[in-house]
Regions:
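Hydrophobic, small-residue-rich membrane helices and short re-entrant helix-turn-helix hairpins
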Residues: 82-99, 124-128, 154-176, 297-306
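Interfacial loop-to-helix junctions that mark the boundaries of transmembrane helices
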Residues: 43-55, 92-98, 125-141, 211-215, ...
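Hydrophobic alpha-helical transmembrane segments of multi-pass integral membrane proteins
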Residues: 1, 180-189, 212-251, 255-256, ...
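Membrane-core helix-loop-helix motifs of multi-pass transport proteins
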Residues: 1-79, 92, 265-268, 284-325, ...
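Core transmembrane alpha-helical segments of multi-pass membrane transporters/permeases
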Residues: 130-200
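Transmembrane alpha-helix interface/packing and boundary motifs in multi-pass membrane proteins
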Residues: 11-15, 190-192, 226-239, 268-276
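Helix-loop-helix junctions that connect adjacent transmembrane helices in secondary transporters/permeases
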Residues: 194-219, 226
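Juxtamembrane interface elements at the cytosolic ends of transmembrane helices
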Residues: 63-86, 114-124, 142-162, 288
Length: 346
C-alpha cells in the first residue's frame, strides 16, 4: 500500500500521456508570460514537458520499487494478515453499471478521435502539438468522467433522479472546500501581482543579481528544485504553488535565457517527491485511515511518514541527477522545447 501511495504521490505528474495537470500548469505558465510580455505571441504547449515525463515514469517506478525492496520492506517485516478481511460483493446491477460506463467511455473516445482526425480538434496541418484537443483537454476529461459517472449511476440504480446527482456532487465537493478557498486567494494574489507589476520587478532584480554573482546553469536549476521541495512541505497543492511561483520565476528565468517550459519542468521535479509524506496533504491522512481500518490498527502517522521520507529523498536525488544528465545530453524536454529560449523571443 505504501508503494502504491508513493508512486501516485511522489511520482505525481510523471505520465506516459499528456494529462490534465500538464494543461493546468501550462495555463499558469502562459499567464505569467503574458503578464511579463503583454504583446508577445510566444506561449508554451501542454506537451512542453512530455518527453521528459515519459522517461520519468520509468525512473520513478524503478527508484520507488528499489526503495521498497531494500529500505521499506526490511523495516516492516512480513505481513501475515488478520484473516478477517471481507470484500464486498459486486451486485448484478453494479456490474451492469460498470458495463454501461465502459461502453459510454468507448463511444466518447471514438467520437473525440473522429473529431481529431476529421479536423475540428486537430492543430494546423493536422498537428497534435498546439491542437484544440490539447488546449481543451481539461473540459474533454471533465465530460468523459461526467458521462461515465452518470451512466454508472443511473444503470446501477445509485441515481434515481437529478436530485441524487446533485447530492453526490455536493458530497464529493464538500471535501474540496478548503482547496477552492485557497484557489480564490491565489487568484487574488496573482491578480494583484500582475496589476502592481511586482512580479516583473522581482524577476528583473532577481535575474540581475543571479547573473552578477554567476549563479546560473545547473546550480541555479538544482537550487530552484530544492526551494520548490521545501515549500511543498507546507503547501501541498501543485497548482496553488505554481500560481504563486510562476509570476516571479518564469520571467526571471526568461531574462536569464531559459525556456518557460524548462522552468515549469524544474518546478514539477521539486513539487512531486515530498508529496508522499507532507502532513499538509489530505491524502496521507486518508491512507492512514485505510491502513488502520484494513491492515494495522495501531499504525501511527509518524510510522507512515518515517517510511515515506527515505523514499522521497532518494527519488528527489535520482530525479535531479536524471535532469542534469538530460540537460548535458541536450535532449528536448518536449516537442520544440529545450533549455534555452528560441531566438527572437526576448
Amino acid at each position: 500500500m505504501m508503494v502504491g501511495y508513493a508512486g501516485a504521490q511522489a511520482g505525481f505528474t510523471a505520465n506516459l500521456m499528456v494529462a490534465g495537470t500538464d494543461t493546468l500548469l501550462q495555463g499558469l505558465t502562459n499567464d505569467a508570460i503574458k503578464a511579463f510580455m503583454p504583446e508577445t505571441t510566444f506561449a508554451v504547449d501542454a506537451t512542453c514537458n512530455w518527453f521528459f515525463m515519459i522517461a520519468s515514469t520509468f525512473l520513478c517506478s524503478l527508484v520507488i520499487g528499489w526503495c521498497s525492496v531494500h529500505m521499506i520492506e526490511p523495516r516492516l517485516g512480513k505481513y501475515e494478515g488478520s484473516g478477517n478481511a471481507k470484500l464486498d460483493e459486486v451486485t448484478p446491477q453494479q456490474k451492469k453499471g460498470l458495463h454501461a460506463a465502459g461502453i459510454t467511455a468507448l463511444i466518447y473516445m471514438a467520437l473525440i478521435a473522429v473529431l481529431f482526425f476529421m479536423g475540428p480538434l486537430a492543430g494546423e496541418n493536422g498537428k497534435f502539438v498546439g491542437s484544440p484537443f490539447l488546449k481543451g483537454l481539461i473540459p474533454i476529461l471533465f465530460v468523459l468522467f461526467s458521462i461515465c459517472g452518470l451512466s454508472y449511476g443511473y444503470v446501477s440504480g445509485s441515481f434515481k433522479n437529478i436530485n441524487d446527482v446533485n447530492k453526490a456532487m455536493a458530497k464529493q465537493m464538500a471535501g474540496m472546500g478548503s482547496y477552492v478557498l485557497f484557489c480564490f486567494f491565489c487568484g487574488q494574489f496573482q491578480g494583484l501581482f500582475n496589476w502592481t507589476k511586482l512580479g516583473t520587478l522581482l524577476a528583473i532584480g532577481g535575474a540581475d543579481f543571479l547573473e552578477n554573482v554567476g549563479f546560473t546553469g545547473i546550480p541555479l536549476c538544482v537550487a530552484f528544485i530544492l526551494l520548490c521541495s521545501f515549500v511543498n512541505i507546507f503547501v501541498s497543492s501543485g497548482s496553488a504553488k505554481w500560481a504563486i511561483f510562476a509570476p516571479i520565476f518564469v520571467p526571471m528565468f526568461m531574462l536569464l535565457g531559459y525556456h518557460p517550459g524548462f522552468t515549469q519542468l524544474c518546478y514539477r521535479i521539486g513539487d512531486s517527491p515530498f508529496n508522499c509524506w507532507t502532513p499538509m496533504s489530505a491524502y496521507i491522512w486518508m491512507i492512514l485511515s485505510v491502513a488502520q481500518t484494513k491492515y494495522v490498527p495501531n499504525l501511527k502517522i509518524g510510522t507512515l511518514i518515517a517510511n515515506m521520507i527515505p523514499m522521497s529523498i532518494v527519488l528527489q536525488i535520482a530525479w535531479i541527477i536524471f535532469l542534469v544528465i538530460w540537460m548535458l545530453l541536450g535532449i528536448p524536454f518536449g516537442p520544440g522545447v529545450g533549455i534555452y529560449l528560441p531566438a527572437g523571443v526576448m
